[in-house]
Regions:
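Glycine/small-residue-rich hydrophobic helix-like segments
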Residues: 226-272
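Intrinsically disordered, low-complexity regions enriched in Pro/Ser/Thr/Gly and acidic residues
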Residues: 201, 207-244
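Long, contiguous amphipathic alpha-helices that act as assembly "spine/axial" helices in icosahedral shell
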Residues: 47, 77-139, 177-189, 279-295
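Short alpha-helical segments and helix-capping/turn motifs at coil-helix boundaries
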Residues: 27-34, 170-172, 272-273
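Short helix/loop capping segments that flank catalytic or ligand/cofactor-binding pockets
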Residues: 55-58, 101, 194-197, 204, ...
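N-terminal "assembly arms/tails" that initiate or stabilize quaternary assembly
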Residues: 1-83, 303
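Extended, compositionally biased alpha-helical segments that mediate assembly or anchoring
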Residues: 3, 266, 271-309
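Extended, solvent-exposed, turn-rich assembly/linker loops in the middle of proteins
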Residues: 135-218
Length: 309
């Protein structure tokens, strides 16, 4: 038998911390999370883009003439993200099971329900990523096309052009002056299979460790990109992006006043709420883990897609 002896905040914190190691795709993008809402602002949050500054040149002649330097303002844009979806996992805790079978509420209730919630995040991010266009194989500077288009950049099924495709992806992002840090290539299962068959990449393969889902998903590191497999993406789809191309916002709502046990917590870009209460009609407890979710393209110029021939 297990009971609610562990403080709700401790259970919730451990559940949120576990999400970091149970997720891959969400950890490669911009994340914005808070425990609770700021009153009066509704369900749309403004996620900040990186701060930008401008540079200027002061010539030797200007210095000799004592020409004053010019000051500019730092700029920052915000992307509105609507928290449209409530992702949740709700379970019943029948009295007989709760009394004689359950041994650890934290491990057997809180953790599995939190895992169910985090499993939904990559699915929703994948829906967003497939909207990004691919460069044309014949002309990198031409207008973008859908990744399945006959003109789109594609990886050959024999993996013979893996390095050429990665070089093109880097060229496209570099030409757009996208930062070279935090770059990722995420691919569906068919693309991942082709890449892993390439013998030239065998020595560059990244070995997984510590049971970390992001490490487990990493296929290789190529030309400044971390290449990961994401099964929720279309199997013949791949996308190269910098972290701030996409954003994911999570909010853990306030614990209801009627809940006898509960807490919310945000950490490292993830947020969850755990609540439990009693169902008098069934003489049993109930547990819910949830979060309000929203995702958006922050800057489409920081991403480019490709397909599989």
């Amino acid at each position: 038998m297990a009971n609610f002896t562990t403080p709700a905040m401790k259970v919730t914190k451990s559940s949120v911390a576990a999400l970091r190691y149970l997720s891959a795709l969400p950890r490669t993008i911009n994340r914005d999370a808070e425990a609770g809402y700021e009153a009066g602002y509704g369900s749309t949050v403004n996620v900040p883009m990186p701060v930008k500054a401008t540079a200027a040149t002061r010539t030797k002649g200007q210095r000799a003439a004592r020409t004053a330097i010019n000051y500019t303002d730092l700029t920052r844009q915000y992307v509105p993200v609507e928290l449209a979806d409530q992702i949740y996992s709700a379970v019943r805790l029948p009295s007989d099971w709760y009394t004689w079978t359950l041994q650890s509420f934290e491990d057997e209730v809180a953790k599995p329900t939190a895992e169910a919630v985090v499993d939904e995040l990559p699915k929703k991010l994948a829906e967003l990523m497939v909207t990004i266009q691919a460069s044309q194989a014949a002309d990198a500077s031409a207008a973008g096309v859908g990744y399945a288009d006959s003109k789109a950049l594609k990886l050959k099924s024999d993996s013979s052009n893996v390095l050429e495709v990665v070089a093109r992806l880097a060229r496209v992002l570099n030409s757009r002056e996208v930062p070279t840090t935090d770059r990722t290539i995420a691919v569906g299962s068919a693309v991942a299979e082709v890449i892993q068959k390439n013998r030239d990449l065998a020595s560059a393969a990244y070995q997984a460790d510590d049971g970390d889902s992001l490490h487990e998903a990493i296929i290789s590191r190529l030309k400044g990109f971390t290449v990961i497999e994401e099964p929720r993406l279309p199997e013949k789809f791949g996308i190269a992006y910098q972290r701030d191309a996409f954003t994911m916002a999570l909010r853990a709502a306030t614990v209801p006043l009627g809940a006898s046990y509960g807490a919310n917590h945000a950490e490292d870009g993830f947020a969850l709420r755990l609540i439990c209460d009693y169902d008098p009609d069934q003489a049993e407890d109930r547990a819910v883990v949830d979060a309000f979710f929203g995702a958006a393209v922050m800057d489409a110029q920081r991403a480019t897609a490709f397909g599989l021939a």
